[in-house]
Amino acid sequence: MKKIAILTSGGDAPGMNAAIRAVVRTAIDKGLEVMGVQRGYSGLLNGELFAMNRTSVSDIIQRGGTILRTARCPEFKDEEVRKRAVKILNAYGVDALVVIGGDGSFMGAKLLSKLGIKTIGLPGTIDNDLAYTDFTIGFDTALNTIVDAINKIRDTSTSHERVSIIEVMGRDCGDLALHAGISSGAEAIIVPEMGEFDRDALCRTILEGKNHGKTHSIVILAEGIGGAEELSKYVQELTGIEARATILGHIQRGGAPSASDRVLASRLGARAVEVLLQGETSRVIGIRDNQIIDQDIDEALAMESKFDLDLYNVAEVLSR
């Protein structure tokens, strides 16, 4: 193996730059050439490849987003489109591709490997929705961003003695909502893993809190459930307490990565190069019990969600 390429795909996540830096510098240290692919699979199809060196990744570990840019590429599901991508990689002399992204990005990597391109996946998504790894790159930073926002919202919620319903990202995974809720002392956490929730029961919980002396309530709502505005109106009508909805949106994806995400991304990026040099392909890198692991991509994508029910139950007790 002489040359590898690296791309970021799908939604951006804080820490992607730290992972890029780790891959590039580890690869160069091992005597490999590195090419960056701009704008994910879409950029690959357009031949947007360029040579990278140590300087290319200087002063980026502290930056959010991705210096390689990112994009979604639904047309990559077409095999003829993927064959065109393989031809482009071959034309540049690329022996292997490192893909940083979520499950959709991993699926693209898996399909490329079936066409003869060695691929390795790094988990880059704030959603923490990849079951094979305890944490994904970007989750910790997004969590801290959410908690910081909740702290500010709680200030005004306390002043106005109102209910604040805060919708957070995570797609169909409730990890961000759960961890943010327990970290911020939320009165209620609503996640898709717990099934359809009872709006009337939520209202009773809020009223019970008021009877026990609580002057305000914070409700964390996962976007997999959604409907923050509608829920706030319902709560206000049934409880008689002023309620406001806040959808945090894309602020959760931005900002300088946390120290934890920088360390995680660096460890995962370095391991990706090592696995490639061992001749492996169609693998994904992750962390389990603080140990860096690699796993077959098919096995990883087939694993079921790992929602922490014990932590949810702790949050339920502490919120009363």
Swiss-Prot record:
It is found in: Cytoplasm. Pfam families: PFK. The active site is at 127 (proton acceptor). Mg(2+) binds at residue 103. ATP binds at residues 11, 72-73, 102-105. GO terms for cellular component: 6-phosphofructokinase complex. Pathway: Carbohydrate degradation; glycolysis; D-glyceraldehyde 3-phosphate and glycerone phosphate from D-glucose: step 3/4. Keywords: Allosteric enzyme, ATP-binding, Cytoplasm, Glycolysis, Kinase, Magnesium, Metal-binding, Nucleotide-binding, Transferase. It is an enzyme of class 2 (transferase). Substrate binds at residues 125-127, 162, 169-171, 223, 244, 250-253. It catalyses: beta-D-fructose 6-phosphate + ATP = beta-D-fructose 1,6-bisphosphate + ADP + H(+). GO terms for molecular function: 6-phosphofructokinase activity; AMP binding; ATP binding; fructose-6-phosphate binding; identical protein binding; metal ion binding; monosaccharide binding. It comes from the Bacteria. Its EC number is 2.7.1.11. Allosterically activated by ADP and other diphosphonucleosides, and allosterically inhibited by phosphoenolpyruvate. Its cofactor is Mg(2+). Homotetramer. Catalyzes the phosphorylation of D-fructose 6-phosphate to fructose 1,6-bisphosphate by ATP, the first committing step of glycolysis. Belongs to the phosphofructokinase type A (PFKA) family. ATP-dependent PFK group I subfamily. Prokaryotic clade 'B1' sub-subfamily. PANTHER family: ATP-DEPENDENT 6-PHOSPHOFRUCTOKINASE, PHOSPHOFRUCTOKINASE. This is ATP-dependent 6-phosphofructokinase. It comes from Clostridium botulinum (strain Alaska E43 / Type E3). The lineage of its organism: Bacteria, Bacillati, Bacillota, Clostridia, Eubacteriales. The gene is pfkA.
